[in-house]
């Protein structure tokens, strides 16, 4: 079973964690294990805990990393089939209550998820409207498209996809579903194309790209779980521990930037002679500006074009 995926900003993400040989680390988005493989090569006696809510990714990892999953393995890998928003709860279940030395995130959908036609993530393949990263979840894209109000649909398309024709698309969806339910990705693609003016369809890539992105974000509550997970990650990091986050969309990057700022900057009331301990920053930024892919990586990995890496350290 292969979950082939080319990791973006591989060395930058892991090297900025400054891995320790005996450290305890978390891969919040295990996927194909590209970042994990590189980190494990840096920790001789340490442990990596890999999270993924996609059962297919976990099963693939169990085969591809079988030797490192043995109890006496050094370094050791442990896998968790759950969303990274449940970080602290799962660490406690595994017996890790003293914090971690580092954590990293590679956000968004992986290449294998896009390429699995039946998952319904891609507008390039005809499949049932699904888009669930966790197949045990009830809510899927079919439900959103066929049950939300026109305003709710328009808000999702605009807020999560920056789709400037969100109202027109939402209106067309509601009109079409009156005739019959919208079941497949290609049905939705045709509706989107029909809603967007001809001049706009000729530029800016595939006309359904932004709408599919927005629905995926909504189905998986991606922004809410990201914020919750980052808060927990900062809490469980040991002093000196680091957090690396790769984002691909502006709304993801805004959340990371906002939370890093929240914990690294302090507003001290004027005239206060000292900063109380509970007001002191708990993070320091390792890089003020996001790290982006090198020219070489941009040439070899198209997915890296929109990637931004932010790194912070626990004080």
From Swiss-Prot:
Assigned GO CC terms: cytoplasm
Annotated binding of S-adenosyl-L-methionine, by residue: 33-35, 52, 84, 106, 113
Reactions mediated catalytically: cytidine(1402) in 16S rRNA + S-adenosyl-L-methionine = N(4)-methylcytidine(1402) in 16S rRNA + S-adenosyl-L-homocysteine + H(+)
Record localization: Cytoplasm
Pfam families membership: Methyltransf_5
PANTHER family xrefs: 12S RRNA N4-METHYLCYTIDINE METHYLTRANSFERASE, S-ADENOSYL-METHYLTRANSFERASE MRAW
HAMAP family: 16SrRNA_methyltr_H
Protein name (database record): Ribosomal RNA small subunit methyltransferase H
The organism of origin for this protein: Lactobacillus acidophilus (strain ATCC 700396 / NCK56 / N2 / NCFM)
